[in-house]
Each structure stands twice: as C-alpha cells, then as structure tokens.
Design a protein with these regions (language model features):
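Conserved core architecture of multi-subunit DNA-directed RNA polymerases
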Residues: 1-542
Length: 542
C-alpha cells in the first residue's frame, strides 16, 4: 500500500521518489533481529560485523504478529516505510537490472491484519504485464459453454498428445488413431478460449520466474508456447462463490468461451445461460492466494478459492444439470406423445436423463448426442452485443430479428425493453445523481455535501524528510484545496434517453409506457437544462 504517494494511477515509482512514506500496516516483530517489519519475512537490511548494512542483504527472519487492537475491525497501525531501500533490496534479490516502467500498487489494505504481499511479486507481475485480483491471483474470464464430445482437430491438439492424456479410445470404443475421431470429454477437462492462450503463457512464465528468483526453486511449467500448457491443471471459479473446481487444459477453441462438461459447469454453480467464469493456473493459486490479504469487509470472502473441489460428484451438483438429455436417439412413441402436448413430467420416464444414471459410471461417461457438427467453434466468435457499437444498433438488431419471427410481436418486445431496462435504469440514475458525493481530484477524499469553500478542506499532509515524512498535518492552514468533481455525471443519467425515444418513435409502445418515459425524460431535462429565466420590469406587465 502506498496511500496517495503514487498519484492517481497508484504507481510505485512516485512513491520511491519520496523515500519514506507513511502507511497503515500490521505490526509484526522479527524473531531474529527483533525489529518491527510488516512483512512475513523481515525486510530490514542485515548488519555485518562492523555494523554496516549492504543493499540487497536483508535479515529475512520470520516475523510474528503483535497483539494490538485484537478486537479492531482492522488491526494495522500507521507506520513509516523506507520505500527506496525496500524496493532496491527487492530488485537486487530478484536479480533484475531495472524496475518495470509501471508497477501498480494499492492505496490501502482492507484485510483484518493488513499484512502486505511481498513487493517482489508485484514487480514480477509488472514485468509480464499481468493484472492481479484482490486475492493475489491472476485470472482470465470466459463464457461458459457446455460440451460432451469433440475431435482432436477441433481443439488444435494432435491425437497422440491426447492419447497421453488418457483419451485412448473414441466414443465408439475404437482405439484413437486419427484427428477426426470423436472423443467424449472427461468431466473435469477444459477447452480454453484461444484468446486466453497468450495470457496463460505469460502467467506461466511469471510463475516460473517467481519460483526461480523469489523462492529459489526450479521452474515448474517451462512453457515456450501455449501448447506446452496442455495437460496442466487449472482452477475454475464462478463469481459470488468461494469454491474452485479442479480442471485440466486439453485444448483451445477459436471463440470467447470455455468448453467443459455440463456437470463441471454445474459444480461451479453455473447453468450456461451467458455467465462468465474465471480460470487460474493451479500453481498460481497455490503460491499467491492467501486468506490474509482478503478484505475484511462484507463480501470480502467471496470470489476467492477458499476451498478446492478435486473430484466431481454428480450427486452433489444442481438438479438442472441432471436434467440433461443423454440419449442417442428419440423413440417413436416420444414423437407421438408430443402430438397430445402432455406435461413434460408425464413422459419423463421415456427419456434418458442424467438423473436416471446416478449411482453408476454412466452418470459421467457414455453420454449420447443426436446431431453431429463439423467444428464446435464455427459459430460467431463474439456476440452481436459486443460487435455492435451503439445501443441504437443493438436495439435495431434485436427488433429486426423480431420482425422475422412470426411468433413475436415487435411492439410488445419494444415496450418490454423500455419498461424493464431503460426506465428502471433512468429512474435509478436520477436518484443516484441527487444523492451523489463529491470527490477531491487531488487527495480522493469524498464529501456527502459540497463544502462552502468549493474546494477540498482536508488538512494537507506534506511528505519528505523529518516530521513531514510521517504525514503530520500542519497546525495552521495548509488545506488540500483540490478541485471537487461529481461522482455521477450527466451523461450517465441521460445515456438511454435518446435510445428510448428512438425505440418508441420507430416501433411503438403502449400509452402507459410512453407517458412514463416522457415523464422521466422531462425530469432529467428539468434537472440539467437551464430554464433561461428573464428579469422582467414593471413595464412588461402593462
């Protein structure tokens, strides 16, 4: 953490220029030199026999947390950190010539003990241009796509390599000898989006460099190209959950989605209706994830792999995945029964669902399919919602499709979109604009009400040598005086008004929806537009 010493971009170099900074960190004591250090390993420079310290040679002893503020929400205390010496020691220990141009830091730690991550990890991540999640891991998001069968050609992996991963026979039981044979995917195998190949490769190189330079161990991945990651383990994690699922990379798909078994997606608590989940290299999670750096506020334990499911159990997943049809064909009496339009439960005994296979190997193997395809990734690489730029283009695309479908009433679709999307968004943005805070562009302090001075009135904290380096505010004067900015802009409120009027004028909506939309639009106009009041004299009324 560097507070405001790194500027708006929270960069490490500006904080180094200030040499000593004042930040809130947990208090720990070294068991070797008995000096205080916020890190798990003492960062102070070791002294030789003559009492002199040398750059790059640190104590490195284990530290123990001090018993302070045991009942506090966050147990850290404000203390001084010599940034220039600490970063220089880290650079020398890593054996690199210079720091990356941009090393991102955080303003403050939200964890309970406020124990910082080793600064060497942030430096190495910046060398490979990798982002970091709040739990210390590097993740890549992709849409969930279910799959049961594939061909080696479709995932860009030779059949001989898949043979070494356990795919010895195709779905008909014949030995695997060709790239065109159809294979049934194992429940915990994963086909990654090709766009993630370079990202995962950079992550693997970062992990290897971390093992060699920081942990003084042998590299693990030794990956020179993306195909070298085939067969390595990953951890898949869905948002708003705290349990990862173990998986294995077996290939690449030319799309923006990740292909996996339906039971695998269900184990992540997902049903493949457009959700996006994250994957991370397993070694990254084992090395860098820590509960000690998770936020202590509400929801801080979510989106973190607190537990890892190593073996998928079909009886423990959501029932929605157990309703997957796994038959090879539909019998004649099924088609005849559909003529009477019965309730699905009345004919479910005629269907081969996964639920009926529980308790046997057939629950995870031997799934069937009724239609084959040439390539699993032959569909659109990106959805139209991403390729179409403006919201008007997106609405035209949706309603143009409604014109082609006889069972769709375009006017009802337009009314539904306006009622369920545009109007609630406009109403919520109007409320947010009226209740917003103002934020200082200099020190990032926020106010519920605008100060009468029109500028930031927080005491200014000088940095440098002496007492000022401790962040001591001046006794008199010395206010921040930074410019204040709104946190909710006019554009955020009015962004859908033009689109909403376009939909109502071109496709038509019911009268109630139009009146509601006009009323909210006029409310926005009265909030932002100047009424241009004129000063009148008495003669104007004669």
């Amino acid at each position: 953490p560097i507070e405001l010493h790194g500027g708006n971009q929270r960069l490490l170099n500006p904080a180094i220029d200030k040499q000593t900074i004042r930040v809130q960190l947990g208090r720990r004591t070294c068991t070797v030199c008995e000096r205080e250090s916020p890190y798990l390993r003492c960062h102070h420079r070791a002294l030789d026999a003559h009492g002199e310290a040398k750059a790059g040679e640190t104590c490195g002893g284990r530290t123990q947390a001090k018993e302070t503020k045991s009942n506090a929400y966050r147990r850290g205390e404000v203390q001084s950190v010599r940034m220039d010496e600490m970063v220089e020691d880290a650079r020398i220990r890593l054996g690199i010539d210079r720091l990356p141009a941009q090393v991102k830091c955080t303003k403050k730690l939200n964890s309970r003990d406020q124990t910082p991550e080793a600064i060497e990890k942030g430096i190495l991540r910046a060398r490979h241009s990798l982002p970091v999640f709040r739990d210390g891991t590097v993740r890549y998001d992709m849409s969930d796509v279910p799959i049961t069968h594939f061909r080696p050609r479709e995932i860009g992996v030779p059949w001989k390599k898949l043979h070494g991963l356990g795919y010895t026979h195709d779905y008909r039981g014949r030995p695997l000898e060709d790239d065109e044979q159809t294979l049934e995917i194992f429940p915990q195998d994963f086909i990654v989006a090709k766009g993630a190949a370079d990202f995962l490769l950079r992550t693997a190189k970062y992990i290897d460099e971390l093992l060699v330079r920081f942990y003084k161990m042998e590299p693990y991945y030794n990956a020179d190209k993306a195909d070298d990651l085939i067969g390595h383990l990953i951890c898949a994690l869905a948002p708003h959950t705290s349990g990862g699922v173990l998986s294995r990379i077996i290939g690449w798909a030319d799309c923006s989605g990740g292909y996996a078994h339906p039971l695998f997606h269900a184990a992540k608590r997902r049903n493949c209706d457009g959700d996006e989940d994250a994957i991370m290299l397993l070694m990254d999670g084992l090395l860098n994830f820590s509960r000690d750096i998770l936020p202590a506020n509400r929801g801080g334990q979510m989106d973190a792999p607190l537990v890892l499911t190593t073996r998928l159990n079909p009886t423990e997943v959501d029932k929605e995945a157990l309703n997957v049809d796994s038959a090879w064909f539909y019998e004649r009496d099924f088609y005849e029964a559909t003529l009477q339009q019965p309730h699905p439960k009345d004919i479910q005994n005629r269907m081969d669902f996964v639920e009926r296979r529980l308790g046997s190997v057939a629950a995870v193997r031997g799934y069937g399919f009724t239609h084959d395809c040439f390539a699993i990734d032959r569909g659109p690489a990106l959805s139209a919602y991403k390729t179409l730029e403006t919201m008007i283009d997106k609405m035209n695309g949706q309603l143009a499709l409604g014109h082609r479908l006889r069972g769709v009433n375009v006017r009802q679709v337009a009314s539904s979109v306006v009622r369920s999307h545009f109007l609630p968004d406009l109403r919520g943005n109007l409320n947010a604009y009226g209740r917003q805070k103002v934020r200082c562009l200099k020190c990032a302090h926020s106010y519920r009400r605008m100060p009468l001075s029109g500028t930031c009135i927080q005491p200014k904290k000088e940095t440098g040598r002496g007492l000022s380096s401790m962040g001591v505010a001046k006794a008199e004067g010395g206010l921040c005086n930074g410019n204040l900015a709104l946190t909710v802009s006019e554009g955020a409120v009015r962004k859908y008004i033009e689109v909403m009027r376009f939909v109502m004028d071109h496709y038509g909506v019911d009268l109630y929806t139009r009146q509601n939309a006009d009323w909210l639009a006029s409310s926005a106009d009265s909030l932002f537009n100047n009424d241009r009041a004129k000063q009148l004299s008495l003669s104007d009324f004669l």
